[in-house]
Design a protein with these regions (language model features):
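Short, well-ordered beta-strand elements within core beta-sheets of diverse protein domains
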Residues: 47-54, 68-75, 161, 270-273, ...
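Rossmann-like NAD(P) dinucleotide-binding subdomain of oxidoreductase/dehydrogenase enzymes
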Residues: 138-280, 410
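ALDH superfamily catalytic-core signature
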Residues: 208, 244-390, 453, 496
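Structural signal for hydrophobic packing residues in well-ordered secondary-structure cores
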Residues: 70, 74, 89-96, 100, ...
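Conserved C-terminal structural/oligomerization subdomain of aldehyde/semialdehyde dehydrogenase
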Residues: 46-49, 234, 271, 326, ...
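Glycine-rich loop-to-alpha-helix module at the N-terminal edge of alpha/beta enzyme cores
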Residues: 46-136
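Hydrophobic face of amphipathic alpha-helices that form TPR/SEL1-like repeat modules
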Residues: 1-43, 368
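Residue-level signal for inorganic ion chemistry
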Residues: 45, 81, 103, 126, ...
Length: 497
């Protein structure tokens, strides 16, 4: 098969071609057991392929391949590693449309508004990190005229990366691109809901990278992710997902005394001050809530605090704009909003909507379910804007990970800051105001790892990204994160006498 998508091979055909396979040591290979599990299109529930059912034996094979490749990859000059990773990014850019269609097929994210964006960011991330190969610098430390004291940055070894289903390609890139440039080899465990797009990414990259440098497994957490975390040859774990799973991984890594990076949940606040530009703030709420992704984002602006003077107008404008968004087949170019990813998540989101009503909230359901009969069984959920929810309600306190946001009133700036910070999460926050002093003060006082003013959604590979509180440990993206997460420091003292 050509490395390009054959014109008459649609994304369904590509999923079938990748079915039943991991990628280990540069080649597609079935699970040791031969077992597979079914993956369905969330919009119609039609089967799209069978993913390899990864277990401990598959983990052993993938890690062994990474160990074999480790020394040669680490010995490759850093600048050359960077060139190879950047070349991967350019090749992935040539494959953007097929990757976008494949990730839309398995996740239900709208092709036009979400999946193509993810495929573009994927390529950009590898190109960006590829340029950092020359930045793996240590330091010279003044100590004694007769001694040369330096620090070196060395790779950790084999990195285990466990990725989520909501933006699988992008979040995988933010983990493995810096790991590879830093000289590590990688074993990725994909989410069971979205195994094919990232497998295709790995297949494409293995045309450039040496065998064993980048390996990928599909499977479920206990059978595949667990053995990966506890494997004795894994020297670092990076994970994006739920808080509870993150705690489990943290405990397992602690037994081995290896470093972890955890990007976990969020319940991100958005503050709209009385002097804010109302139209811009409403538009920011739509992008911030990731309604086009059915709200399936850890940074979703799911708590919106609006000054009492703007509250009613804000809610009406937000309802009208979300109501105008088109929900439909993710592959349709007219579609703004696709589906929830799975039945489990679909039921979870709907249970929270029911709970919000019971907790006293007024639910404003927006947009309209698709009328196409073939989509009748799909995991479509109308976006819901809650008003009047108590601050201690579960719908305000807990991460829903769906198209559900709560709009609440405040009267003073101090009240808004207090409500925004009253959460066990601390991933992202935004404030909308025309007052520079208010904006600057808020950036200092908001308890979040990523704060934006008068905008939302901007996440770039050269900006550190990560949360505080229960939103995780460590940062991703940026040069600093690459050095902190994927290198270990060695001190060298040379006595020259």
């Amino acid at each position: 098969m050509s490395n390009r998508l054959i014109p008459d091979l649609d994304c369904h055909g590509l999923a079938r071609a990748l079915s039943g396979k991991h990628l280990i040591d540069g080649v597609l290979a079935p699970a040791v057991s031969g077992k597979t599990f079914e993956v369905r299109y969330p919009a119609t529930l039609e089967p799209i392929g069978e993913a390899a059912y990864g277990e401990a034996a598959d983990v052993d094979a993938a890690v062994a391949a990474a160990v074999r490749a480790k020394a040669g990859w680490a010995a490759t000059p850093a600048r050359e590693r960077g060139k190879l990773v950047a070349e991967c990014g350019r090749l992935l850019s040539d494959h953007q449309e097929e990757l976008a269609r494949l990730v839309a097929l398995e996740t239900g994210k709208a092709l036009r508004t979400e999946s193509r964006v993810e495929a573009s960011v994927l390529a950009d991330a590898f190109i960006y990190y590829g340029g950092l190969g020359s930045e793996l610098k240590g330091e010279s430390v003044p100590f004694n005229p007769e001694m040369l004291t330096v620090t070196l940055r060395e790779p950790i070894g084999v990195v285990g990366a466990i990725i989520p289903w909501n933006v699988p390609m992008m979040l995988m890139a933010y983990k493995i691109a810096p790991a590879l440039v830093a000289g590590n080899t990688v074993v990725v465990k994909s989410a069971e809901e979205s195994p094919f797009a990232v497998l295709r990414v790995c297949q494409i990259m293995n045309q450039i990278l040496p065998p064993g440098v980048f390996n990928i497994l599909s499977g479920f957490g206990p059978e595949c992710g667990g053995p990966l975390v506890v494997h004795p040859d894994i020297g670092k774990v990076t994970f994006t997902g739920s808080v509870e799973t993150g705690k489990t991984i943290y405990r397992a890594a602690a037994e081995k005394l290896i470093p972890v990076t955890l990007e976990l949940g969020g319940k991100s606040p958005m503050i709209v001050m009385g002097d804010a530009d109302l139209e811009r703030a409403v538009a920011g709420a739509i992008t911030g809530m990731r309604f086009t992704r059915q709200g399936q984002s850890c940074t979703a602006a799911s708590r919106i605090y609006v000054h009492d003077s703007l509250h009613d107008a804000f809610v009406e404008k937000l309802k009208a704009k979300v109501d105008a968004m088109v929900m439909g087949d993710p592959m349709d170019e007219k579609t703004d909003i696709g589906t929830i990813v799975s039945q489990q998540q679909y039921e979870r989101v709907n249970s929270y909507i029911d709970l919000g009503r019971k907790e006293g909230g007024t639910a404003h359901a927006c947009s309209a379910l698709p009328e196409d009969a073939k989509l009748a069984k799909g995991y479509f959920v109308r976006p819901v804007i809650f008003t009047d929810l108590p601050e201690d309600s579960r719908c305000i306190r807990e991460e829903i990970f769906g198209p559900v946001t709560a709009v609440s009133r405040f009267t003073t700036y101090e009240e808004a800051i207090a409500k925004a910070n009253d959460s066990e999460y601390g991933l992202a926050a935004t404030i909308w105001t025309k007052d520079l002093q208010t904006a600057l003060d808020a950036t200092k006082r908001l308890e979040a790892g990523f704060v934006q003013v008068n905008q939302n959604l901007v996440v770039l590979p050269n900006l550190s990204y990560g949360g505080t509180k229960k939103s995780g440990l460590g940062k991703e993206a940026s040069l600093d994160a690459m050095l902190d997460n994927f290198t270990q420091q060695k001190t060298v003292i040379l006595n020259m006498t």
